[in-house]
Swiss-Prot record:
GO terms for cellular component: cytoplasm. InterPro entries: RsmH, SAM-dep_MeTrfase_MraW_recog, SAM-dependent_MTases_sf. Belongs to the methyltransferase superfamily. RsmH family. S-adenosyl-L-methionine binds at residues 43-45, 62, 89, 105, 112. It is found in: Cytoplasm. Its EC number is 2.1.1.199. Residues 276-302 are annotated as: Disordered. Specifically methylates the N4 position of cytidine in position 1402 (C1402) of 16S rRNA. GO terms for biological process: rRNA base methylation. Pfam families: Methyltransf_5. It comes from Nostoc sp. (strain PCC 7120 / SAG 25.82 / UTEX 2576). This is Ribosomal RNA small subunit methyltransferase H.
Length: 302
């Protein structure tokens, strides 16, 4: 009997912000406070911050023009309380000691996964794009079709934690060029043993994660953000970061801990309750870490 490979293991994404109460509690949103959401997306967390206390001011940042358009619509009622900025959070010009709280939600939005032309998911046939900021030039197609076999194997292993990285890279080089997400996913599936091919998750899952990380320089951007963001906090201000896979969480954990400006408040990451996971499956893999700007540390220190 012929088996049909399982589709990618993805939560059924919704527009609900993950860990909503935990974020608001962790940031200690106060009346008249100034907050920075560097991954505004559709505006879910930003709305919660704006509604948590009166006279809150919020700067909403995103590198994706489509996300900013959606956020402007979602947050229109707050008028001049919200300032919108299109920027990658690593490139954002953080003003010194300006915010009571900074939030980053590192998850890929349902919009990106469910919009075929963006090329983030192989559930849909689409061009190999994966650019969060469509103003940039490097796409997933460039990586897959132009990088050599060793480079591909290395990124699949490093950023996708894919143990069959060499085998998959060899097949990709043999079969390329690739033009669509589904073509690539099929080639990956055909390169692995049947037990792996019909496993719990689609064999292309980790490769697609690695490609997305490389195309958007996600981990380097995260490192830069964690280095720069604390300087933008007032003494006693807090930074909250939500990650969704182990590579991100490791960087967040060590980045917050190693910052001379911060005191980590979460010994272990905050995770979703069973009730939240039932209502919002995307929250299943979310991990929230929070740190506070040290009052006695000057902003001139690195």
């Amino acid at each position: 009997m012929t088996k049909t490979p399982l589709t990618i293991e993805e939560p059924i994404f919704s527009h609900l912000p993950v860990l909503p109460q935990e974020v608001i509690t962790g940031l200690v949103v106060r009346p008249g406070g100034r907050y920075l959401d560097v991954t505004v997306g559709g505006g879910g967390h930003s709305r919660l911050i704006l509604e948590a206390a009166p006279d809150v001011k919020l700067t909403a940042v995103d590198q994706d023009g489509d996300a900013l358009t959606a956020a402007k619509q979602e947050l229109a009622e707050f008028g001049e309380q919200v300032k919108f900025v299109r920027s990658n959070f690593a490139a954002y010009d953080f003003p010194s000691t300006s915010f009571d709280g900074v939030l980053a939600d590192l998850g890929v939005s349902s919009y990106h996964l469910d919009t075929p032309e963006r090329g983030f998911s192989f559930r849909h046939q689409a061009s190999l794009d994966m650019r969060m900021d469509q103003r940039q030039s490097l796409s997933a197609a460039d990586v897959i079709n132009d990088w050599d076999e060793v480079e591909l194997a290395n990124i699949f292993f490093k950023y996708g934690e894919e143990r069959l990285s060499r085998r998959i890279a060899r097949r990709i080089v043999e079969k390329r060029p690739f033009h669509t997400t589904t073509e690539l996913a099929e080639a990956i599936a055909s390169s692995v043993p049947p037990k792996y091919r019909y496993g719990r998750i689609h064999p292309a899952t980790r490769v697609f994660q690695a490609l997305r990380i490389v195309v958007n320089d996600e981990l380097k951007s995260l490192e830069t953000f964690i280095e720069k963001a604390p300087k933008a906090l007032v003494p006693g201000g807090r930074i909250a970061i939500i990650s969704f896979h182990s590579l991100e969480d490791r960087l967040v954990k060590h980045g917050l801990r190693n910052s001379p400006l911060l005191k980590v408040l979460t010994k272990k990451p905050i995770i979703a309750t069973d009730d939240e996971i039932a209502n919002n499956p995307r929250s299943r893999s979310a991990k929230l870490r929070i740190a506070e700007k040290q009052a006695e540390t000057g902003d001139e220190d690195n």
